């Protein structure tokens, strides 16, 4: 009969049903029987007493007591012998699997197959892990460890003597077993020593330990069911623990339960979800503020323990639950001022009674409110790092920042209150940490956003709470708030150079973001952070890079092209903007870094809403480089005497690559627009260059795009004028200022000012005739095209000679008289072989025969030509 249709409701029937279920789970092995015999055996099982349930059930017959049988039962008994149920308990089955694995290891030892030994050893460790949960270490396992260790030592000893090496598979298997066995043997060293001392005595009691009392387990399951029912009928809180024990939650037992949870913290096989449920019930039955504070402190810590992996992040549900519980904790400690949570407090050891607090005194509870809010902040950041920023989920997750900011401000108010009480000896560093967190949440935001965020925060904070650092209603704008927070950190961070430096970088970033270039520049220069930033941590270096870039963008918005280019040069010229600004990892560098370094770099990435637009950054950098490099190209082309200098190697490489292209189509991206504009500006077509620059759509991302475009037009006109004068000055005797003014659509006064500046800086060999409003160029200063090419050839020839001299010196190191030539031809200068000397120099006369071979590095085609002319 199926067990679902039995009408018997007695406890014995219930236990037998549990036994049948357990037997099914443990793979019941039975021989075929007739249906009538199965019915008889099941009816007999119903009448079986509890004593029979204590047997192991392996190879036993099931049925009624032998003394209660009549003669008619003999036939059924004899027929029942033919189909006996063989029931193996879970523990017995695992022991058999363990013995089979140990036997497989022995077989691998016989054929010296370390590959199979390694695989079976891993399997053995997995199997024994399940058995260790229910009792002591199996002695079969200890025996296998000891014998495997002996065989491994024997094999290693043979390898030292035998010159023949193992194959690669065996060698890898041996090394793997060696490492794993070393770790495993330490954990069971005592048992291994006992086994080696007396193997027979150690293995005697093994059979008794192998037998697993299956029916008792079924009975305990039935008892657990009864306890669950009893617990449900009870009025108080109760839950079922291990072994079916009912846990009763009362206010008196809260501290004991918390101690149990704290002791199990960090251990393996700890069900944190179950602990969280228990603590939620404990909070509901908590009767005093002290109990609530203790439960909340432990509960929040346990929630954070659920995400200890480096690649995982706290789920939104868990984060919101932790944030809500943290807000509740703040409310409790704000209401009950006699209890304070500080890091320096001693734990309360007596779980039987609650602490009593006298009037006017304060009781310290160990904990850290600041660490909790920092962890909430870090978990939110990690969550934003892993979410796709182009989805609605990111926006939804970002909305949690306002709740976090409210908790940060409330934590700051609480720490201010604690720091006023000198008896608590709370370090100033804790308050500085939370002030720094508040500053880091506002420094990169626009003023309007900060104002709304701060106003909503004070509305959510209870009216009786106020701050001494930023009093309620005193902060009218974002700039005042940032200045107050930064000044507080400047004053109260003695011995905390890193915190002070980060506060200064945040303030510089804020000033640059709001177009206060000169103040941001002066603060950056006066701080001297560029001299010590290499000694700071990576996060501070990233903040420094972000601040430097923001100062450069601020200079560009102010029309200071040279300052913007020099500021952005270090970041944009490296080609590693993503890494330096923590906005991504360069793909081509994956093969150059270890997985740990790559993981750390990904952990340092900033959330998407804090990113600086890299395309805009590149556009600004290339535009500034164009406005500086194109006039410099024209100047060096017409005046070779000027020392060649490179402002931006990155820009020059891009420009050279663009010029090498045979066919250039219309510009498609930002870089193409700048390159086309550069080409037009070099040809004097400033209007065309302006059109290319204005057609870049990235300018729309700036705060005032029309003003930016107007500024760029003026800059292109001025640099176009300079480029024109540098390029075509050799072809003019005089040039009217009015003509230049009409060509470049600039006022006469502006043209005269630009020309005067060029003349005063000795960039242009000319004079300005203010009476006739014209420019008079001086002749003989500029070189012709032939002269320029001759000078270029001379420079290359001298460079070739110096290169050959260095090569010869490298090859003849340590050789005496290496530079002494036969016939008195020596080095440069002097009476022997020098330039202009009497013998053998350039232009000199020498009657000595030339030596054949490669030791003479002067001469060649150029030397022969000089010699023939001489």
Curated annotation (Swiss-Prot):
Gene3D superfamilies: Winged helix-like DNA-binding domain superfamily/Winged helix DNA-binding domain (1.10.10.10). One of its GO terms (cellular component) is eukaryotic translation initiation factor 3 complex, eIF3e. Residues 1-92, 807-870 are annotated as: Disordered. Residues 608-782 form the PCI domain. It comes from the Eukaryota. It is found in: Cytoplasm. GO terms for molecular function: RNA binding; translation initiation factor activity; translation initiation factor binding. Keywords: Cytoplasm, Initiation factor, Protein biosynthesis. Residues 824-844 have a biased composition (Gly residues). Residues 14-54 have a biased composition (Acidic residues). One of its GO terms (biological process) is translational initiation. Component of the eukaryotic translation initiation factor 3 (eIF-3) complex. Component of the eukaryotic translation initiation factor 3 (eIF-3) complex, which is involved in protein synthesis of a specialized repertoire of mRNAs and, together with other initiation factors, stimulates binding of mRNA and methionyl-tRNAi to the 40S ribosome. The eIF-3 complex specifically targets and initiates translation of a subset of mRNAs involved in cell proliferation. Belongs to the eIF-3 subunit C family. PANTHER family: EUKARYOTIC TRANSLATION INITATION FACTOR 3, SUBUNIT 8 EIF3S8 -RELATED, EUKARYOTIC TRANSLATION INITIATION FACTOR 3 SUBUNIT C-RELATED. This is Eukaryotic translation initiation factor 3 subunit C. The gene is nip1.
